[in-house]
């Protein structure tokens, strides 16, 4: 993969370049080779260790469990972009992969989202309501913090986008909105 044109890459990306020219470019973002730490950093603007997600729960060594940076829940007092935008009057929704905790107080509603349809696991099948790894028996989907299921004609990307649109259509269109849409299909099985 290469950078967008606005960031010096050789790919022609005129629409993205135009957006970049009218917006803000963030140049200090850090990614992790693991999904939860990357999402925690993206949502908070903080280093993964400070968020509580230095790794993912599925590979957390026993000796690190519960230690600072390895709580596998967003640390107390850590604010997400959704927290900040909701406080500024935005309607906030998320639809897609969460994997930042599924206990009470760890779901998206506890972190600034008005509405959410969230996959709490590291991943799930893109076509069926089932796990794609032996860590989980079922795919743990939640709507607004309550256990949920997906429809029979489920395809993850279509469902995630359709759910986000449904949430936006059901809210006050006069308010600005923040829609966080972390797709599941970037994970296996592709």
Where are these regions (language model features)?
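Formylglycine-dependent sulfatase
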Residues: 1-190
């Amino acid at each position: 993969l290469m950078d967008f044109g606005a960031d010096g890459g050789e790919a022609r990306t005129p629409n993205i370049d135009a957006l970049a020219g009218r917006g803000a470019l963030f140049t200090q973002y850090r990614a992790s080779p693991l999904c939860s730490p990357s999402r925690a950093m993206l949502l908070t603007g903080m280093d993964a260790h400070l968020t509580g997600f230095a790794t993912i729960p599925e590979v957390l060594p026993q000796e690190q469990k519960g230690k600072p940076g390895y709580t596998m829940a967003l640390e107390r007092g850590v604010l997400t972009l959704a927290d900040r935008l909701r406080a500024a009057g935005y309607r906030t929704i998320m639809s897609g992969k969460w994997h930042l905790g599924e206990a009470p107080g760890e779901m998206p509603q506890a972190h600034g989202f008005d509405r959410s349809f969230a996959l709490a696991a590291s991943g799930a099948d893109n076509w069926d309501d089932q796990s794609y790894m032996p860590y989980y028996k079922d795919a743990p989907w939640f709507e607004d913090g309550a256990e949920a299921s997906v429809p029979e004609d489920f395809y993850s990307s279509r469902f995630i986008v359709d759910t986000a649109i449904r949430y936006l259509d059901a809210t006050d269109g006069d308010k600005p909105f923040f829609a966080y849409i972390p797709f599941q299909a970037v994970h296996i099985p592709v």
